[in-house]
Amino acid sequence: MVQQESRLKVADNTGAKEVLTIRVLGGTKRRYASVGDKIVVSIKDATPNGNVKKGAVSTAVVVRTKKEVRRADGSYIRFDDNACVLLNAAGEMRGTRVFGPVARELREKQFMKIVSLAPEVL
């Protein structure tokens, strides 16, 4: 469960390491984001020679959350950290690699590129 001011790790190779959530997309009263939801983020920590710079604003999709997500079969999935993947204006991945496992819910939300590049889909 990610909300405004939440800090997340970045699970791709764009050069960003940590981001701060500015907004959860999907309506004015939308408070929380879970796996597969889009958020607006500000880059707080980045590598010196990466594609993104510190302070830049971008959109991202949440790929892992510490708060468990309930599935249709009654099982739950949770991860050790909150992580996201940065997106460009067209809604496509900015990076070319994904680090760490991602949730199967991304496939249902049509983020096929992220699912195909991830080393493990849980």
From Swiss-Prot:
CDD domains: Ribosomal_uL14. SUPFAM superfamilies: Ribosomal protein L14. Keywords: Ribonucleoprotein, Ribosomal protein, RNA-binding, rRNA-binding. GO terms for biological process: translation. The keyword Transferase does not apply. InterPro entries: Ribosomal_uL14, Ribosomal_uL14_bac-type, Ribosomal_uL14_CS, Ribosomal_uL14_sf. Disulfide bonds: none annotated. One of its GO terms (cellular component) is cytosolic large ribosomal subunit. One of its GO terms (molecular function) is large ribosomal subunit rRNA binding. HAMAP family: Ribosomal_uL14. Part of the 50S ribosomal subunit. Forms a cluster with proteins L3 and L19. In the 70S ribosome, L14 and L19 interact and together make contacts with the 16S rRNA in bridges B5 and B8. Binds to 23S rRNA. Forms part of two intersubunit bridges in the 70S ribosome. PANTHER family: 50S/60S RIBOSOMAL PROTEIN L14/L23, LARGE RIBOSOMAL SUBUNIT PROTEIN UL14M. Belongs to the universal ribosomal protein uL14 family. This is Large ribosomal subunit protein uL14. It comes from Flavobacterium johnsoniae (strain ATCC 17061 / DSM 2064 / JCM 8514 / BCRC 14874 / CCUG 350202 / NBRC 14942 / NCIMB 11054 / UW101). The lineage of its organism: Bacteria, Pseudomonadati, Bacteroidota, Flavobacteriia, Flavobacteriales.
